[in-house]
Amino acid sequence: MKVLVNNHLVEREDATVDIEDRGYQFGDGVYEVVRLYNGKFFTYNEHIDRLYASAAKIDLVIPYSKEELRELLEKLVAENNINTGNVYLQVTRGVQNPRNHVIPDDFPLEGVLTAAAREVPRNERQFVEGGTAITEEDVRWLRCDIKSLNLLGNILAKNKAHQQNALEAILHRGEQVTECSASNVSIIKDGVLWTHAADNLILNGITRQVIIDVAKKNGIPVKEADFTLTDLREADEVFISSTTIEITPITHIDGVQVADGKRGPITAQLHQYFVEEITRACGELVFAK
């Protein structure tokens, strides 16, 4: 397996990171995950635009143009012969010796790019049968719109869900539902798609954006606004979405069944529209059972 370290492809076992790298010591960096279908990137530009936007919000300079970055990632995918999978890439602020919280202004740090590509099949069974979720207080920082390497709050929530045999943790600040530990959450109520507004309390998921777009194109009303735990529990349908899980229904929350406990009709419609978008961009799909 080859991975990318700056502009070099190296064997996985030969890849190293400096112990004084600010990403390693502070989580000072940003990242993205881009999906591949049939060896082709899906919503690549949207992901990379978000990467550069996140970097700009923390005054981090990515040392490659968007065109140079795409060329590097395409080489990474080709070298590893990825058909259906994910590319994980991150950029840290770089090496600072000695370690200091303050970003130096007397010399520029050189950002460090790393990336890896892996084959990850689609999970059609999960898309249909769904999964369960727990609810958990959202204790993360207040700039969740930045796709930062700082993920400890997400990790703790996700691990708590795992310990309870749940797929996800749905996060809330008081009564207000925000998102999940590793995905966005949406509900369907009286035929309306309802999802949290794209503000600083959530990451504006690329899959979320595609879902909103196809919903509007197909006449499904969309409401981008806060909703409560009560709204969540009384919803007709609940689903989570992300680059890796596409659109996955939630059948139970905190052990309580959502509606009839099955994927709802609008969730199914939205996933079909989503698959059509993938097919247009990347070709016909093969489902993993």
From Swiss-Prot:
<dbReference type="GO" id="GO:0047810">
    <property type="term" value="F:D-alanine-2-oxoglutarate aminotransferase activity"/>
</dbReference>
<dbReference type="GO" id="GO:0030170">
    <property type="term" value="F:pyridoxal phosphate binding"/>
</dbReference>
<dbReference type="InterPro" id="IPR005784">
    <property type="entry name" value="D_amino_transT"/>
</dbReference>
<feature type="binding site">
    <location>
        <position position="101"/>
    </location>
    <ligand>
        <name>substrate</name>
    </ligand>
</feature>
<dbReference type="InterPro" id="IPR036038">
    <property type="entry name" value="Aminotransferase-like"/>
</dbReference>
<dbReference type="InterPro" id="IPR043131">
    <property type="entry name" value="BCAT-like_N"/>
</dbReference>
<dbReference type="GO" id="GO:0046437">
    <property type="term" value="P:D-amino acid biosynthetic process"/>
</dbReference>
<protein>
    <recommendedName>
        <fullName>D-alanine aminotransferase</fullName>
        <ecNumber>2.6.1.21</ecNumber>
    </recommendedName>
</protein>
<feature type="binding site">
    <location>
        <position position="99"/>
    </location>
    <ligand>
        <name>substrate</name>
    </ligand>
</feature>
<feature type="binding site">
    <location>
        <position position="179"/>
    </location>
    <ligand>
        <name>pyridoxal 5'-phosphate</name>
    </ligand>
</feature>
<comment type="subunit">
    <text>Homodimer.</text>
</comment>
<comment type="function">
    <text>Acts on the D-isomers of alanine, leucine, aspartate, glutamate, aminobutyrate, norvaline and asparagine. The enzyme transfers an amino group from a substrate D-amino acid to the pyridoxal phosphate cofactor to form pyridoxamine and an alpha-keto acid in the first half-reaction. The second half-reaction is the reverse of the first, transferring the amino group from the pyridoxamine to a second alpha-keto acid to form the product D-amino acid via a ping-pong mechanism. This is an important process in the formation of D-alanine and D-glutamate, which are essential bacterial cell wall components.</text>
</comment>
<dbReference type="InterPro" id="IPR001544">
    <property type="entry name" value="Aminotrans_IV"/>
</dbReference>
<dbReference type="GO" id="GO:0019752">
    <property type="term" value="P:carboxylic acid metabolic process"/>
</dbReference>
<feature type="binding site">
    <location>
        <position position="31"/>
    </location>
    <ligand>
        <name>substrate</name>
    </ligand>
</feature>
<dbReference type="GO" id="GO:0005829">
    <property type="term" value="C:cytosol"/>
</dbReference>
<keyword id="KW-0663">Pyridoxal phosphate</keyword>
<dbReference type="InterPro" id="IPR050571">
    <property type="entry name" value="Class-IV_PLP-Dep_Aminotrnsfr"/>
</dbReference>
<keyword id="KW-0032">Aminotransferase</keyword>
<feature type="binding site">
    <location>
        <position position="50"/>
    </location>
    <ligand>
        <name>pyridoxal 5'-phosphate</name>
    </ligand>
</feature>
<feature type="modified residue" description="N6-(pyridoxal phosphate)lysine">
    <location>
        <position position="147"/>
    </location>
</feature>
<keyword id="KW-0808">Transferase</keyword>
<comment type="similarity">
    <text>Belongs to the class-IV pyridoxal-phosphate-dependent aminotransferase family.</text>
</comment>
<dbReference type="Pfam" id="PF01063">
    <property type="entry name" value="Aminotran_4"/>
</dbReference>
<dbReference type="InterPro" id="IPR043132">
    <property type="entry name" value="BCAT-like_C"/>
</dbReference>
<dbReference type="GO" id="GO:0019478">
    <property type="term" value="P:D-amino acid catabolic process"/>
</dbReference>
